[in-house]
Amino acid sequence: MIVITSRIRVTGGDADALAVRYRNRVGLVDTLPGCLGVEILRHVDRPEEFMVVTRWTDEDAYTAYRAHPAFRKAHQAIAELPGLRIDPTSRVVERYDVLS
């Protein structure tokens, strides 16, 4: 199993609207083959910071998701939020192997 984390920080626009979009996109991803779960996290002290945590059976399942129309649809829904700006230096995507 692998875990993918994706972290961003909103610098303009409505972070609450982004939180709603994130909640709505979960159904686009968690039903795909190989997806074991999705969590959307919002930092307690810095509410403009978000982290998406996805769990996949293996790297092939994650790669297939990135090529799936659901990947583009989920990211497009976020990009379409009026006035939303994401700090490009805050975007961090990391992969982890699950050891236990």
Task: Tell me what each language-model feature is.
Residues I2-I8, E39-R66:
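Short, well-ordered beta-strand segments in beta-rich or mixed alpha/beta enzyme
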Residues M1-I2, A17, P33-C35:
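Short, flexible segments with low predicted structural confidence
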Residues R21-N24:
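Short, solvent-exposed amphipathic helices
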Residues V10, V29-L32, R95:
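A generic structural signal for ordered secondary structure
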Residues R9-L18:
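Short, surface-exposed ligand-recognition loops at beta-strand->loop->(often short) alpha-helix junctions
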Residues G27-L36, R55-S90:
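An amphipathic, aromatic/His-enriched active-site/gating alpha helix that lines ligand/cofactor pockets
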Residues I2, E39-E48, Q76-S100:
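Glycine-rich beta-strand-turn "strand-cap" elements at beta-sheet edges
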Residues I2-I4, A15, V26:
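Short acidic/polar alpha-helix capping motifs at helix-coil junctions
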